[in-house]
Amino acid sequence: MVKLIYILWAPKGQPSQTTRELLLNKIQPRLYDAGVKKLTIYIDDEFSNVRSSAPKLYSGPEISAELSLWVDNVERHLEIEIILQSGLFTYAGYVVEESIYTEYGGNKHFHKRDWPDGQRSPVLMAITLMERPQKLSREEWIKRWHGTQSPVSEAMQPRARYIRNVVLQALTPDAPPFEGIVEEAWPSVKHYTNPFLFYGAGKMNVFKLAANMYRMLRSVSAFLELNKIRSSTMSEYILKS
């Protein structure tokens, strides 16, 4: 099977609750009719409206949702896009190669998944869209992301799940030039908004916090331009696993 990711922007001014209901109640069943075999939707809704402890330098429009889906043939994207158009979404589609670095229950920070398909996951999601700096070859960029940043962040941060998606191909005209899409689950809002938890600095250890922030900044800036990192908090709905 092939994994596709669609980044969605809802019509300007549309309430997040309307976006969620449209995606879950109307778009979801039609996607199965279009041949989608597995589906997770990440939605910027009222349950995920929080600020990160990480600095945010990008000031462009926030994304409304991400569709993460599996199909048996990439040509299915044409049917999928007709469905998205019916919801009046602006969208960008990509073929990706997924690698799960940490699964639910894969570390001490969270338990194995024990909730059913269709129920909102008891975590806070962070979806990050990444562009490769032109000064780095694609090979070197992936090496720094997978070989350095992933283990550095895993050792430091209390994530529940970490999925890396390397973009293989853009499906839609004028799609932003993202080459990586990260799906991170955090055990709670507090783990994402409290800098001491977010950076693995323990209980109010300001020296460890400063050291870890510096280490993270060096690791991230070695493969990304900070002002181009787009990160959004979302709710996760695993709909068909």
At which residue positions do the language-model features occur?
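Macromolecular interaction modules
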Residues: 1-241
